[in-house]
Amino acid sequence: MKPIEERYLETLAELFPTIARTSTEIINLSSILNLPKGTEHFITDIHGEYEAFSHVLKNGSGAVRKKIREVFGRTLSEEDISELATLVYYPREKMELVRQEKDEEQMDNWYRVMLYRLIAVCRYSSSKYTRSKIRKALPKDFAYVIEELITEREDIEDKEGYYEAIVDSIVRIGRAEPFIAALSELIPRLVVDHLHILGDIYDRGDGADDIMDRLMSHHSLDIQWGNHDVVWMGAAAGSEVCIANVVRVCARYGNLGTLEDGYGINLLPLATFAIRTYGEDLCSCFRLKGQKQETEDTALNMKIHKAISVIQFKLEGQIARRRPEFGLEGRALLHRIDFVKGTVGLDGKEYALLDTNFPTVDRDDPYRLSEEEQQVMGRLKSAFLGCGRLQEHMLFLLNRGALYKVANGNLLYHGCVPLKEDGSFEEVLVYGRIFRGKALYDRLETFVRRAFFSTNPRHREEGRDILWWIWCGKQSPLFGKDKMATFERYFLAEKETHTEKRNPYYDLLDEPEVAERILREFGLQGEHCHIVNGHVPVKKGQSPIRCGGKVLVIDGGFSRAYQGTTGIAGYTLTFNSTGLRLVAHRPFTSTEDAISTGADIHSERVMAEDYTRRLTVGDTDIGESLRERIQELSELLEAYRNGTIAEKK
């Protein structure tokens, strides 16, 4: 048998069968190494807030407006820059608004002006890419014309006349609007080369399904799963306890529309059961979070909220007892209730319950679902497993996502790396074996994927159960607290019972040796390596910059519920050829305001790490892959020249 290296070169020779083809590819790849590094955009904790997320995606955390300023900063007024930026963000809506204010001749002139401006921004933004990469980004309908307009043509003497003729033709034949829309959608793609989503796409907002659709159409991205994403993944895999958690969170925030309208999940059996079981119950402990005034559906939603919460507590008790290694016996609380006194025993103390109406709880077997509850969960499970759109979204999360990512010297994850008080890695038991640090992440991810893809029923069940543990487990890297005090927050008035103690990780992030230890664990070390961390909102007075800039906490703060705590809408990060930029955003008002007034999200740069020289593709992970490819092609070239492999002309 031939050595594997020789077999590999023979396979490579099928793609590059001649010396000329091989040499050309080496030259092409070598030239790419010297191009400027593309811009990376880091967003986290979207929490289902589609409008705000969509706007940040369109404006690249200010990167698009920055490009416009670089092109026109000395020639356009601030008003004109805002108009052009709005056109890039919302081309169709902006053109419809302008059309209402201008006659046909004025509109044609406006089209011409905007076309020239958009072409200039496209040309400037595309300067760091190869023609091949630009062609792949171009919209098919206008690919040839756009390439002509944004590419310098040295063979044409009257360039201005050439471009003017193209623009006039576009306007004359009535194709200005779709062409402007195509250019506007191209610009953000050219400005931001790659997108990183650091978790929690799902949660309380009502647009998570639309966010997933948007991400699925994105040209280049990766996802680090958040705790809210993982519980949805568990639900889609058929975990009943995860399904109950998902439905409860949606009910708690008045967001059942994501389930019913977004995914077509039939909640009628649950609603019918809730009305029949809790019809006379005011369910006052189950008021909706963030609801400013009651609607005609409020009473029903509160009953649904209570019904699914009780089911959740039962299912969690079942799994806590079935999986004692998870260490979640403390979440099984129903058997600790004294139904006569209306109290619950917790940590050696007795607390009065705020709600004592539990008609479906069997005093002798409190974690057993009633027959009706079993039927409700059976219907919900079938709906989650049978929802094509949900399964498609979860498959995308699995294919493009992971628990962490190492990218261009940065370690990206949601939550925390579980640590002991002394800063060493916490030892975590996962199905009979101890894991810590990177090995813990890798092992957990294996079980997550088994929940969906394993053909072994036991492995699939282990995967489904571990998804719930990742959602709320004490040592879970995505949860990072000693308990999820859901029961206590509903039923107990005493605030001390609501406390969820955070993992020591969060208090140790300013220790250089801790940050360096985490980075080394994931294969990173050096001056320009960072931890980029999502999950925890940065409160007023706190800094997102930890450990002298080694750790960047970039909770996007899209959730309106947290904006009163943070005082802003959150942080995002960009990383381009000149360095890193941490940007703080003010809350987004609405898409309507952005279109009608040109209002953008007000962003303020709070940190810049500038490099002494401009980074190139050669300085990135892609550059490392390209150098490996060049080395392989060079070996093939040598094999052709020394006669080891024959050319196939």
Regions found by a protein language model. Give the residues of each.
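Feature recognizes metal-dependent phosphohydrolase scaffolds
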Residues: 1-649
